[in-house]
From Swiss-Prot:
InterPro entries per record: GcvP (IPR003437), GDC-P_C (IPR049316), GDC-P_N (IPR049315), GDC_P (IPR020581), PyrdxlP-dep_Trfase (IPR015424), PyrdxlP-dep_Trfase_major (IPR015421), PyrdxlP-dep_Trfase_small (IPR015422)
Gene3D superfamilies registered for this protein in UniProt: Aspartate Aminotransferase, domain 1 (3.90.1150.10), Type I PLP-dependent aspartate aminotransferase-like (Major domain) (3.40.640.10)
The organism's place on the tree of life at top rank: Bacteria
Enzyme Commission code: 1.4.4.2
Gene from which the chain derives: gcvP
Modified sites of kind N6-(pyridoxal phosphate)lysine: K685
Subunit structure: The glycine cleavage system is composed of four proteins: P, T, L and H.
Name listed for the protein in its UniProt record: Glycine dehydrogenase (decarboxylating)
Length: 932
C-alpha cells in the first residue's frame, strides 16, 4: 500500500478502516476492484502522473514562499483599473480569511444563506446609491467583462436590431481588448468617436477615461438619447463618492470595478465588478440578483431573484453564460463601505483627488503638459522621448508608473499614497509639490447625500464590525459547519495551508502590469501550474486567464472558432450539445457565435450515439464542435465516449470536454487521451479554490497542440482575443491550486479521485433500498455522484423534492443539487474530503426523511401540516407559546432523535416565498428619505 504524507491523509476524509468498511459494504475486496468496475478500461491511464513528489504543508509553504519571494513588490502608481488598497484588518481576518465566508456555496438555498445574501444586498444598495440607478446585480467577473456584458444588455434591449457600439472615450486597453473579443462572434460593430447613428445600440462613456480625464460628453449623450441608443458609463466607484451619479447625467447603465474597495490587486484578481441598470433593463441583465421577499411567517428574507434569466434555466437563450461571479469580493467591498461609511469613503476620495491635483499643479508649474483639466486620481503627462527614462528613475525609488507610449506617462494615486510619494514623484519631473485645488468637473460634483441607510452608519468600532460579520456568518451553513453534498459542484476541503499564501504581500500586492522582471515569482508559479495541468489532462497547452468556468467554456469555444477560421472554414458554426448538458454549455456556444443543435439521450442517461451520428453527418459541412461532460451529468462513466469523439472528428468538428466532473478523472484518465481537443478545468471544484458563496472561480482551459495558437492573448503581451481583464485572470488565487497539487503529488491526486468514487458509490448503496438510484453504469456503479429519485415520496405522500431539501436543513445539511439534471430528484456528490461519519449522517437523514414521508402517507400526519411541508423550523417558531402541529417540537428540530443538540444549526428564516419575491422585486435598500 502506498504511504502518503500527512496532508494527503488529512485531505481525504475516510480513514483506512473506513475505506475497508465501505468497500465491504459494496461487496468489494479492494479499491482497485471498484475502479475497474466503475471506470471503463478503454479510457484508464495505465501509468502514474508525472508530477513532483508530494510535500508536507510546511515544506510546500516554504517552497512557494521562496518562489513568490522572487516577486519584487514596489508601490504601484500604474493605475489602469488596478489600485493599491488598505484592506481593513477586521475585514481581512473576519471575512476574507474566514472559512465561514469563503467555503460557502452560491446561495440557491436561501434559508441557509441569509448572511451572505444580506451582505450582497448591501453591495447592490451601495452600487445603486453610487450610480443613481435602481437595480444592480450581485457582482460580475471584472470591469472589462462587465463592459462587454453591458453592451450585450444594450443589444438585447434593441432585440438585436442594432449592432453598432460607440466607444465615446478612451477606455483601458484591456477593456477594449475584451470587448473586441466578444464583438466578433456576435456581430457587434465597434466604433470610436462621437458619431451616433440609427444603428447605434449604445455609447460607452469612461468616467474618467484611462488618462484620468473627465471629458465633455454632453453632446454625444444628447445625440444618443435622440437616436434611442443607451448610455453606458464606465465609472470609478471611489470617484462616485464625490462625483455626480451617472444616472443624473443620462446613463442607462453603469459598470466598473470595486477592487479599490478594500480588495488587493492580486496581480490581476480576483475582484468584483459592478453593473447597475435602469428599471426597464432589469429582466435582461446578467449575473445574480439578490432580492428581498418574506418567509412563511412574514419575516423579511433574502433570496436570489429572477433566476429564469439565467443559463441553468434559459440555456442558449440566457442573458449571459455567467454563473459563478465574485461574491466573496463583492462582500468585501460591501463590508469596506459599511466600515468606512459615506463620510469615510468621501474622505479617502478627497485625499486621493487632492494628491492628484497637487501633482498636476506641480507639473504644470514646471511646464509639463498634462492631459485634460478635470481629473480625479490620475495625471497623464507628455514627456517627449523620456517616458522610459522617467519610469526607470521612479522604479529605482521603489515606485512604478505607467508608460503609455514613448512620450507619455501616467501617475495614479490611491488610498495608500503618501506625501512622501507625492514629493518623490514630483522630483522625477524636476519640480516640487505645490498647493492645488481638487479638479472636479464643474457642475458634476455629488451634491446629494448617499448611503443614508442605517447599515452604513452603524459599525464604526471594530467590536461592532467584528460582531456584525460574525452575526451574518452564523446565519449561514458553509463547509466549516457541515457537508455540502451538491452534485456537480465538488464542495471539497479548502485546506488552510492552501489558503494562507493568498494574503502574502508577495502574492496580494502586485499590479498585473508590473515589469516582467519584478514578477518572476508569478511567472514560475504559473508556469509550474500550466505544466502540471497539462500532465493531469494530457493537453499540450493551458491558459490560466479565464476567471470562471463559464469563461473557460467561452475561451475554449473561441479557440475552436479561431482554429476553423484560420483553416478557411469560418462557416463552421454548429455546436452539438447533449440534452443533459449544463446550462452554461448552450449559453457559451451562443456567445461564441454558434448555433446549438441538441443531441438526444437514451432512457439510461447515455448519449444516443445514433442521434449523435445522424446529426454530426447532417451538419458535417458546418459542424464546429461537440460539447460533452464526462463523466456525464447523470454521474456515470459512459462506455462510448471515445466513439463519440471519433464521430465528431470524422465530420470535421472539435470536441469540447466540459471539466465540471474532472474530480472523477484525475489520475485515472485524461481528457486529451480520450479524444478531447479542449477542456476547461474548474479550479474552484476539482483543485480546491473555494466557492466563496458564489465566486471567485477560475476556469483555465487545456488544448491540444493544434489549438495552442488560439489560446486567449492579452494586449499587455502584444496579442489579442483576451477573455478577462488581466493576462492571468484571478492570478492571486492560483496559489491555492499550486499548493494543493504540490502537497498531494500524483499518487495523492489519484487517491483523492478513488475516494470520491468510493464515497459516491457507498451513498448509492446505502440509499438504493429506500430511493431509486436513477442512473448507473457497468456493474451497477456510479462515478463521483449519484441521482437519488425522491419522486417516490411525491407519489406516495405528496412530499416534493423541495420539501426534502428544506427538511435536510433541520437535520443540519445543505441540500444536494435539486431537480437537476432530472426534475424532482436530488444529485449527491460527497467528494473525497467527507469522512465516513458525515456520509453516514447524511444517509441516515435521507432514510429518516423517507420514514417521515411514510407517516404522511399513512395518515399519521396531515399532508399540509407535517415536518417536511413546514421545514425548515426556526428557533423562534419552535419556541412559540402555542404549538398546534401534530408533531412534537423535538420532532421538528431534532429529527431522528440521535442528533447532537450542541451542534444544532438554526436557520434564521423559515421557507422563503420565491414567487412573491419575483412579483415584488426589491433588490436594494431604500434610502432613509424614502421613509419620510
Amino acid at each position: 500500500m502506498t504511504e502518503f504524507l500527512p496532508f494527503v491523509a488529512r485531505h481525504i476524509g475516510p480513514r483506512h478502516e473506513d475505506e475497508r468498511a465501505m468497500l465491504a459494504a459494496l461487496g468489494l475486496p479492494s479499491m482497485e476492484t471498484l475502479i475497474t468496475q466503475a471506470v471503463p478500461a478503454s479510457i484508464r491511464l495505465n501509468r502514474a502522473l508525472n508530477l513532483p513528489a508530494a510535500l508536507s504543508e510546511a515544506d510546500a509553504l516554504a517552497e512557494l514562499g521562496t518562489i513568490m519571494g522572487r516577486n519584487v513588490v514596489k508601490k504601484s502608481f500604474i493605475g489602469a483599473g488596478y489600485h493599491g488598497v488598505h484592506t481593513p484588518p477586521v475585514i481581512q481576518r473576519n471575512l476574507f480569511e474566514n472559512p465561514a465566508w469563503y467555503t460557502a456555496y452560491t446561495p440557491y438555498q436561501s434559508e441557509i444563506s441569509q448572511g451572505r445574501l444580506e451582505l450582497l444586498f448591501h453591495f447592490q444598495t451601495l452600487v445603486a446609491e453610487l450610480t443613481g440607478l435602481p437595480v444592480a446585480c450581485a457582482s460580475l467577473l471584472d470591469e472589462a467583462t462587465a463592459v462587454a456584458e453591458a453592451i450585450g444588455v444594450a443589444c438585447r434591449h434593441h432585440r438585436d436590431k442594432r449592432s453598432r457600439i460607440l466607444l465615446a472615450g478612451e477606455l483601458h486597453p484591456q477593456t477594449v481588448d475584451v470587448v473586441n473579443t466578444r464583438a466578433e462572434p456576435l456581430g457587434w460593430e465597434i466604433a470610436t468617436g462621437s458619431d451616433v447613428d440609427d444603428n447605434t445600440a449604445a455609447i460607452v462613456v469612461p468616467w474618467p477615461d484611462t488618462r484620468g480625464v473627465y471629458g465633455d460628453f454632453a453632446k454625444v449623450i444628447a445625440d444618443a438619447k435622440a437616436k434611442g441608443a443607451l448610455v453606458i458609463a464606465v465609472a470609478d466607484p471611489l470617484a462616485l463618492t464625490i462625483m455626480e451619479a451617472p444616472a443624473r447625467w443620462g446613463a442607462d447603465m453603469a459598470v466598473g470595478s470595486m477592487q479599490r474597495y478594500g480588495v488587493p490587486m492580486g496581480f490581476g484578481g480576483p475582484h468584483a465588478a459592478y453593473l447597475a441598470v435602469s428599471e426597464v433593463l432589469t429582466r435582461i441583465i446578467p449575473g445574480r440578483i439578490v432580492g428581498q421577499s418574506v418567509d412563511a411567517h412574514g419575516r423579511a428574507a433574502y433570496r436570489l431573484a429572477l433566476q429564469t434569466r439565467e443559463q441553468h434555466i434559459r440555456r442558449d437563450k440566457a442573458t449571459s453564460n455567467i454563473c459563478t461571479a465574485q461574491a466573496l469580493l463583492a462582500n468585501m467591498a460591501a463590508a469596506f463601505a459599511i466600515w468606512h461609511g459615506p463620510a469615510g469613503l468621501q474622505a479617502i476620495a478627497m485625499r486621493v483627488a487632492a494628491l492628484a491635483a497637487r501633482f498636476a499643479a506641480a507639473l504644470k508649474a514646471a511646464g509639463v503638459e498634462i492631459a485634460g483639466e478635470s481629473l480625479f486620481d490620475t495625471v497623464t503627462a507628455k514627456v517627449p522621448g523620456k517616458a522610459a527614462a522617467i519610469a526607470a528613475e521612479a522604479d529605482k525609488g521603489g515606485r512604478l508608473i505607467r508608460i503609455i507610449d514613448t512620450d507619455t506617462v501616467g501617475v495614479t494615486f490611491d488610498e495608500t499614497s503618501t506625501e512622501e510619494d507625492l514629493t518623490a514623484l514630483a522630483s522625477l519631473f524636476g519640480t516640487k509639490p505645490v498647493g492645488g485645488d481638487t479638479v472636479l468637473v464643474p457642475g458634476k460634483e455629488r451634491g446629494e447625500g448617499f448611503l443614508t441607510q442605517e447599515v452604513f452608519h452603524s459599525h464604526r468600532s471594530e467590536t461592532e464590525m467584528m460582531r456584525f460579520l460574525r452575526r451574518l456568518a452564523d446565519k449561514d451553513l458553509a463547509l466549516d459547519r457541515a457537508m455540502i453534498p451538491l452534485g456537480s459542484c465538488t464542495m471539497k476541503l479548502n485546506a488552510a495551508a492552501e489558503m494562507m499564501p493568498v494574503s502574502w504581500n508577495t502574492v496580494a500586492n502586485l499590479h498585473p502590469f508590473a515589469p516582467a522582471e519584478q514578477v518572476q515569482g508569478y511567472a514560475k508559479m504559473t508556469s509550474d501550474l500550466e505544466a502540471w495541468l497539462c500532465e493531469i489532462t494530457g493537453f499540450a497547452g493551458v491558459s490560466l486567464q479565464p476567471n470562471a468556468g463559464s469563461q473557460g467554456e467561452y475561451a475554449g469555444l473561441m479557440a475552436i472558432r479561431h482554429y476553423h477560421q484560420a483553416r478557411g472554414q469560418g462557416h463552421r458554426n454548429i455546436c452539438l450539445i447533449p440534452s443533459s448538458a449544463h446550462g452554461t454549455n448552450p449559453a457559451s456556444a451562443s456567445m461564441a457565435g454558434m448555433s446549438v443543435v441538441v443531441v438526444n439521450c437514451r432512457p439510461d442517461g447515455d448519449i444516443d450515439i445514433d442521434d449523435l451520428k445522424a446529426k454530426a453527418e447532417k451538419h458535417r459541412d458546418n459542424l464546429a464542435a461537440f460539447m460533452i461532460t464526462y463523466p456525464s451529468t447523470y454521474g456515470v462513466f459512459e462506455e462510448g465516449i471515445k466513439a463519440f469523439c471519433e464521430i465528431v472528428h470524422d465530420n470535421g468538428g472539435q470536441v469540447y470536454f466540459d471539466g465540471a466532473n474532472l474530480n472523477a478523472l484525475v489520475g485515472l484518465a485524461r481528457p486529451a487521451d480520450i479524444g478531447a481537443d479542449v477542456c476547461h478545468m474548474n479550479l474552484h471544484k476539482t483543485f480546491c479554490i473555494p466557492h466563496g458563496g458564489g465566486g471567485p472561480g477560475v476556469g483555465p482551459i487545456g488544448v491540444a497542440k493544434h489549438l495552442v495558437p488560439y489560446l486567449p492573448g492579452h494586449v499587455e503581451a502584444g496579442s489579442e482575443h483576451a477573455v478577462a481583464a488581466a493576462q492571468f485572470g484571478s492570478a492571486s488565487i492560483l496559489v491555492i491550486t499550486w499548493m494543493y497539487i504540490r502537497m498531494m503529488g500524483g499518487a495523492g491526486l489519484k487517491k483523492a479521485t478513488e475516494a470520491a468514487i468510493l464515497n459516491a458509490n457507498y451513498i448509492a448503496h446505502r440509499l438504493k433500498g429506500v430511493y431509486p438510484i436513477l442512473y448507473t453504469g457497468a456493474h451497477d456503479r456510479v462515478a463521483h455522484e449519484c441521482i437519488v429519485d425522491t419522486r417516490v415520496l411525491k407519489d406516495s405522500a405528496g412530499i416534493t423534492v423541495e420539501d426534502v431539501a428544506k427538511r435536510l436543513i433541520d437535520y443540519g445539511f445543505h441540500a444536494p443539487t435539486m431537480s437537476w439534471p432530472v426534475a424532482g430528484t436530488l444529485m449527491i456528490e460527497p467528494t473525497e474530503s467527507e469522512p465516513k461519519l458525515e456520509i453516514d449522517r447524511l444517509c441516515d437523514a435521507m432514510i429518516a426523511i423517507a420514514g417521515e414521508a411514510k407517516k404522511v402517507a399513512d395518515g399519521v400526519w396531515p399532508a399540509d401540516d407535517n415536518p417536511l411541508a413546514n421545514a425548515p423550523h426556526t428557533a423562534s417558531d419552535t419556541l412559540a407559546t402555542e404549538w398546534k402541529h401534530p408533531y412534537t417540537r423535538a420532532e421538528a428540530i431534532f429529527p431522528g432523535g440521535a442528533f447532537d443538540p450542541t451542534a444544532k444549526y438554526w436557520p434564521p428564516v423559515s421557507r422563503v416565498d420565491n414567487v412573491g419575491g419575483d412579483r415584488n422585486l426589491i433588490c436594494s435598500c431604500p434610502p432613509v428619505a424614502a421613509y419620510g
